C-alpha cells in the first residue's frame, strides 16, 4: 500500500489545468491519445504560432486526419507571416507538385518523394511519363513496393499485371487507387489461379481487401471470381466473408465449408469463433451446432442467441452491481484523462496478481466503479461480464427503452468511463465528437460548455441521450439508431435506401444484412450495442426475445 500511496502522490503532483494549453506542459505529459488530443487543441488555437504548432505536431503519436487537417490549416493561415517555416513532411510533401519536385530532385529525400507519389496515384493517368519516371527511380531502393505499384500502372494491361504481383503489392495499389479506377480494372478478366495464389498468401492487407470487395455495392465481377476460387490458407475473417459471398449466391454447401474453415483457424478470438459456428448453424440448421455454440465461454450476440434459444445456462457470468463500494470520493479525479491514462497503464503493466489487486483496492468506490470493472475485465480469466448502470439520477428516464439504449451505447462507446478519448478525439462517456458539442449544447439550452465538459458524466450523459432521442425520431429500431450514432444518420440513410439490406425475409435475415454493413467499425458496433441493449433490458426487468426483436428490422418504416 505504501507503493500505492506514493504512486498517487506522483500522479496528483502532475495535475494540469486543461483549460490553458501550454506546450511546455504538454511536452511533459505521457505520449498517447490523450496528449494527441490536447496537442490538437493547441495546434487549433488561433494564438498558436506556426512554429510552435509544428513542434506540437511532431510530439503527436498518431497523426490522424484531424491533426493533419489542423496543421494544414495552420500553415495556410500563417503562410505570409511565416514563409520560412516549412510544414511537416507528411503534409508538405503531399502539397508539392511533382513538376516542382522534379526541378530540384536532389533537394528532396526519398521519403518525401514517396509521399508525393502516393498522393498522386489517383491521378496517375494525368501525369506525363517524363515527370513521373525520374521520380519513380529515386525511390526504387527505399520503397520497392511503391516502385512496383507504379510499374504496374505503366503496363499495357494493368489488371493482368496486378494479378501477377504478390499480395503486398496488390493490396497497396488497391488502396491507393480511386474507386472509379478500381471499377475499371476489376471489370477485366480475373485469373482464378492467380487469385487463389493471392488468397493463400494470407497477407493481412489483402485479407482486409477481400472483406471490402465482398461488402462493396459494385465490384460484382471480382465477387464472382471469388465465388469461383477456393481459398485454403487464409485467416478466419477471410474464410468467413467468403462464406457470406457464397450465401449471397445461394451456394449454402460451399458457404458451410468456409464457415467450418473459419472456425478451424481462429485464434484467441471468441467472437470470430462463435460467429463461424453460428453461421454453420444457419447454413445447416443442425441442433448440435447450436448446442455447441450455447456452450461458448464468451458473451456475444451469437452465444446469447444460442443459450436463449435452447434455454440453457451459459458458462459466462453477468454482474450488474459491485457490492460494498465506498460512497466517498476516490483518491484521484476519474474525470481527468491524463490521470486515468497514467493509472490504467501502470495497473495493467503489473504482472503480479497481488500488486494488481492492491492497485484495484483504490477503486472500490461507487464513483470509480466503471474504472474498477474496466480493469477487472482486462484480466477476465473467469469470463465475467460487467453491466453496471452508474450515474443514475442525472436523467429522469422516460421509459426502460430510453434507459437501456443510453447505457447500451455508453458501455460500447467508453465502458462507462468518463475520461475516455478515442483516436478520432471523440470525448467522454458518450464519445461525443468535438464538432457536435456546440450544437448539442445550444439545443439543450446549456451555456458556457467547453470540450472538457464532456469528461463530466453529468453533462456527457445528457448530451448522448439527447442525440439518441433525436435519432429515434427518424430510425425506429435500436439497431438503426446504433448504426446512426456510430456512422452518422446521413450515411445510414443513404445505405438503407441504396442497398437491398433489411428488405428481404428468409432464414438468413436479418443476420445477413447485419454482416453486410460496409463499415467494419459500425458492423461490430451494431452487434455489440444490440447485445448490451438486450442485457440491460433484462437487468431492468424487461426480457426481449432476440428473434422477434431483430426481425422487427425487416418491418421497419426507416426504409422506403
Predicted feature descriptions by range:
Residues 356-416, 465:
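Export/targeting segments at the very N-terminus of extracytoplasmic proteins
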Residues 405-406, 423-447, 459-468, 490-491, ...:
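Substrate-binding/active-site groove segments that recognize
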Residues 19-20, 29-37, 45-52, 59-112, ...:
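Generic helix N-cap/helix-start motif at coil->alpha-helix transitions
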Residues 260-265, 295-298:
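Amphipathic alpha-helical segments of tetratricopeptide repeats
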Residues 483-542:
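Catalytic and substrate-binding regions of cell-wall glycan-acting enzymes that process beta-1,4-linked
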Residues 213-214, 246, 284:
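Residue at a conserved register position within TPR or TPR-like alpha-solenoid repeats
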